[in-house]
Every structure is written in C-alpha cells, then in structure tokens.
Amino acid sequence: MDISTWIITVLIISTLHAICTWKLYLKAGKKAWEAFVPVYNGIVLMQIINRPKWWMFLVFLPVINLLILPVIWIETLRTFGKKTTADMWIGVITFGLYIGYVNYTQDVTYEAKRELKPATKALDTLGSLTFALIVATFVHTYFIQPFVIPTSSLEKTLLVGDFLFVSKFHYGARTPMTPVAAPMVHDSIPLIKKKSYLSKPQIPYFRFPALQKIERNDIVVFNWPIDTVRMFRENSFEKQHKPIDKKSNYVKRCVGIPGDEVLIKNSELFINGKLVQLPSRSKVQFSYKVKFKKDAQFDINKLLQDLSSTDSYLIQADSSVVINALTDENVNQLKNSGLIDKIEKNISNDKEDLDYIFTIDKNSNITDVENALANLQENRGGVRYNKEEGRAIVYRLNDELLNAFKQFKGIKKTEPIYEIFPNTKEYSNWTGDNLGVVKIPEAGKKITLTTQNLPFYKMIITDYEHHDLQVNGNEIRIDGKPTNSYTFQQNYYWMMGDNRHNSEDSRYWGFVPEDHIVGKPIFIWMSFDLDNKFHKGFLERFRTERFFTTVSGEGQPESYFKYFLILLAGYFAWDWYRGKKKKKEADLL
C-alpha cells in the first residue's frame, strides 16, 4: 500500500465515522459538519466523551490504535447512555458500527457530566490493564525493546543468553508497517506458535528523525532481509513472504556503511582498502585446527572452559581438533600452554564442495533415492529431506556423490546452492574468508548496470525497491524500459558477526536495507547461560558480571548492578521510613 492509497483509506474510514456519528454530534451540541472533517472530527469526539485530545494521536499509531479504538467506541456508547455489558461487547465485536445503529435508531441522551469511572471493579481492572498494555506497546514500539541474543554469531562480544535493551530512537523509531498485529510479540504468538499478524494491509515505510547515523562497527539489530520462513529458525522448505517488520530479528556488527567498499582477504576485513580496526570490546573469533602433542595430558572440555570458548569442537581422524571459535588471546594462550605442536586458522581459499537441492518425483519409485539420503545422513550427516514437499538438500556434496545421485530416476531436478553473496555461478570461487571487492549502495547514487554487476543489485531492484526487472541477453529492462543505469532509493549496510566462522551474515545474503533497521543495543540488564555447555549449576549460570553493563564503549564493560541494588535498598528503606512516620503521625491524631 503506497501513501496515496493509505490517505484514501484514512478518508474512507473518516467518512464512515461521520456517517455513523453525525446525529450524536448534534445531540452533544456540536455541528453536523464537524463529524465530517478528518482528524478534527476525532478531536471534537474527544471533547464530547470528555477524554484527552491526545488520545487522537494514539489512533494514528499502528498496533496501538487496535487497543485504543475499542476504548473510544465503548466511551462513546457510555456517553450516550449505552452502558450495559451487552452494549460494550456489541460495540467492540461490530468494530464500532453499532454506534451507527444507535445513531439512526435510538433516541439517546447526551450525558455531558457522566461518571467517568467504570461502574464495576472488573471494568476498572480491565481499563487499567488496557492502558498498561497501551503504554507498554508504545514504549516497546518507539523507544526501548527487550531482546535476547539467540545465537553465537557475536560471541564473545555478546553472549547467547544476554538480555538486552534495544534503543529504537537512536537510529530513528520506525513506525510499524504491519498495522493488524498482536501487541508485544513479533512474528508468532508464544505457546500456540501461530502467526501474530495479518500480512495485509501494509503501511508505507516511515522513520522518525534519528539521534545519530549508523556508524562503522556499531552493533545493530535489524530484520533479516531474506527471511521467508513462517517462524524464526523453522526447518522447512516452504517459503512465505513476510512483511519487513515481521522478518526475524538479527543482531550483527555494521562493518560497512553506504558508499564503502568491502574486501575480505585471507579472513582479514578491509574497508575502502584499509584493514579494519575494531573497538576494544569486540572479540573477533575464528575457527582453528589444533594439533596437540602426543604426550599432552588434558581434558578438552576443561581446556575450552578455561579459554571461555563456548562454541563447538570436532576431533578429526588424525587426532587434531577443530575448535570453532578462538580469539587471538585464546590462540596465544594455547601456544604458551605447552600442549600443542601446531595451530592454524581454517581459511577457505578455494571453492568448496557445493550444497545441492534435489527436486524429487513423488509419483515415481523413489526408494533408491530415500535409501541413499538415509545412508548419507547416517554416515556423514548434512541432509535435509521433506518427503511431502518432494525436496532434499544435501550439504557439501562432492562430484562423485553428485553424479551418483543424478543417476536416480526419481531425481527430477538438481540445483546447486551458491552460498556466498551474490550467490551466482560467476562468483562461486568466493568464500567467507576471501571475497570482494563489493561496493555498498548509497541512496541517490547512480551506478552503471551491466550483466556482470547485476547479480549484486538484482535483489535490491526487485525485492527491496520493488521494480520489475527483465534481462534478455545483454539488454536490461527495469519497469519495461531498457536501461544501463540505476539510482538507489535508500541506503544499505554490510553486517558481519564477530564469530566469523559461525555467523550467517552479509557474506552470505548481501546488503541490509535501511528500512530493515530496528535499533541499537545499548544495555545488558541480565545474562544467563542458556546453552550450559559446561554443565553448571542453575545459580552459576547467571553471569552477574554482565548484569547492567553497556554494550558499546571503550575498555572492559563495568557492571552497574551493585549500584542498582544500592538504589533499590535505599528505596525500600525510604518507603519503610515514610510508612512508619505516617503511622506515628496518625497515632498522634
């Protein structure tokens, strides 16, 4: 829905409101025309029902308006004598249209000085809960949102189980684009695991003014651009288009801003030709292959615990150990431990075996295919098979196994997956440790389009900026017109995790559009070891040293938890003293 369509929708709703209420405006001593003027009619209605005019501001806030509108409908009915429980329920169930019935068929009286307080304790409680939910939703949507780190892509900078506060206003609060949605939840409703929103209608993208721009090395929360799963981390081939603001929330480090050039060479990150120097708090990790001495005596789990390495490891056939996440400090600790003969970073220099999608003919005999998939999964893993959908993914399939699968009659189609951006055969020699140069698009900047660079910008043109793109040989058509250039409509960013060999980031799916930006993590209020890989006791899993620490800044994070406890104790002491003083004064009276 574009802006003009949205304005027309607002006018239609305003007209419907006028048709349903103009006689009630007359009974309240107002003019009939006042019911027909958009926005102004709502302000007048607030005067009629004796409620604050700022309620009208809430009416225009997506999601919040779903909470305030039923309240306004009920208050309007009560103002004109319709105070029964049945009246209130009918008003809500009919989406306020019951007011139109009252407007034309009922001889009601305007009660200008009615009792505003709810008639029963139950209604009073319901009203209090409703406004508490409105306030919480307002804060959650436009100011601060709680967030939990779900994966180890930023380990050890941010840990799995860090409970964050994410600021919406640092980069400018984005208004919800999906107006019909359950408050205080994201894309699914907890427990029942059902979709929490209606995909249509959609509101045009709008962002309030920002306190600051996104800078290089900022940690940023954003909506995962290529998210097409029904729910976060769902293991299914079935795809579903999701609105921007209902795509899964990701958190990464912004290493490249609009206009930058990104190059990764032998795992080293270069921006605009210069080696990136990350903030002191960042803990970049890589995967290493470690060869221990034959006579070394150690417990691998205890060793990793001492290194605070919380990612996984793999013991290989030659007795070497692949440790998936080590910092430079960890590497030096191992080198000085006297336990190892050799340690080397796992760098992907050449094209590795590809992943493949097999489309399976469910109408033919597929026993051989299923047996081959089962044997492969049992012997080496890396197989996803959905029989109902007739599709399978086999990860890291070498040429010999690929040719064997192609001989099965049950295989209708074989598609390679090029996992590194821009995900095409032409750039299949790029890896997560060696790629680029990639130019990050900037709003308003024009580029020359060719069939060679089009893979980098195809998704921007079609998915993010919603143009029709057709390619016929060397001819490129956008919205039906031949062209050799394109001007970007918004800014884009390059996001990467600090845990470089265990992070799904821009190296795999490309640029993050500006309209996908959610906010800036600013504060860790609690941290709990969700994975518990070292089998700690329950209380030991609380990482109290991380309680009440800031996300950004220089030097080691300082916990403000003790100061919070002091303030909390002071508050309770003051409250106890105040209560005791009041009781003493009452006794004297």
Predicted regions and their residues:
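Soluble "head" domains of membrane/secretory-pathway proteins
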Residues: 118, 160-589
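Cytosolic-side transmembrane helix boundary signature
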Residues: 91, 95-127, 207, 247
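Hydrophobic alpha-helical membrane-embedded or membrane-associated segments
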Residues: 10, 14, 18, 39, ...
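Membrane-helix interface segments in multi-pass membrane proteins
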Residues: 1-13
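Internal/C-terminal transmembrane anchor helices
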Residues: 116-145
